[in-house]
Amino acid sequence: MTALRVNGATRLYAIVGHPIVQVKSPELYCELFAAAGMNAVMIPMHVLPERFDLTMKVLMGMENIDGLIVTVPYKGRAAPFATRLGTTASRVGAVNALRREADGTWTGDMFDGAGFVRGAETKGEVLRGRRVALFGAGGAGSAIACELAAAGVASLAIIDPQIERAEALAQKLRVSSPACRIEVATAVSRDANMIVNASTVGMRESDGMPGEIGELDPETLVGDVVVSEVATPIIRHAIRHGCRHVSGRDMFAGQSDALMSFFTRA
């Protein structure tokens, strides 16, 4: 990586979350900005829940901030700050990226779902026809559910401790993806051949599994949105059973090009 040069004309991008130490975006996007010839940097912002709204207003009011990435747990809370939403963000009610427009307004969109699907396809996985159990119906989970349904999975069982949230997502999917069988579940079905953790479980070293999974058939595809230097509990479980897997790092890589295009309007 070349030496980072910052001056008064440097444009700023920030990633906002709680916690923030786990994120890989600042290093990656500083490199991508430099490769694109942009005088821009991305910085991490650790924002506590009670200060999130104020922080967003302050950041979006700064004239030299051109974009924001939003990570856990704020993807849903960030959506109302956008002047307009892209198609995916409108569908799921959450954003993971915001871009300042020339007139000072802000556009928000969600790339987690597309990033997860692209990450899986890059590894040669075929998603069509899969019977999916999905842990988590928050911003990332909603986006992944939409993209998996669009990719042609046969069924999707949504597992979330907030039943109302899971039911709301299921209802949206039944309308937008009528060919996919959608249900709200409390556990992984025995006929599931794809399991995805789209919850925050696995971010801490002390975390266990997002739910009861049990023994896995080696043909089961396992995914996790948690970006970690080491394998998360669910990915370790998959490896022990000889299952192929899509990690949070795969999802992160899968959406980096789309996010750069979003920020640069390429």
Sequence positions of predicted segments:
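Phosphate/diphosphate ligand-binding glycine-rich loop within oxidoreductases
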Residues: A3-K123, A231
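Short, conserved loop/helix-junction motifs that constitute active-site signature segments
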Residues: V6-N7, L127-R128, G152, E212-T220
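Glycine-rich adenosine-cofactor-binding loop
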Residues: G17, M110, A120, E125-V153, ...
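Short glycine-rich anion-binding loops that position phosphate/pyrophosphate groups of nucleotides
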Residues: V70-R77, A140, T200-M203, S228, ...
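Active-site capping/gating segments
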Residues: R118, V227-S228, C243-A266
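Conserved S-adenosyl-L-methionine
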Residues: A150-S155, R240-R244
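NAD(P)-binding Rossmann-fold cofactor-contacting core
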Residues: V153-S176
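Rossmann-like adenosine-cofactor binding region
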Residues: S177-H245
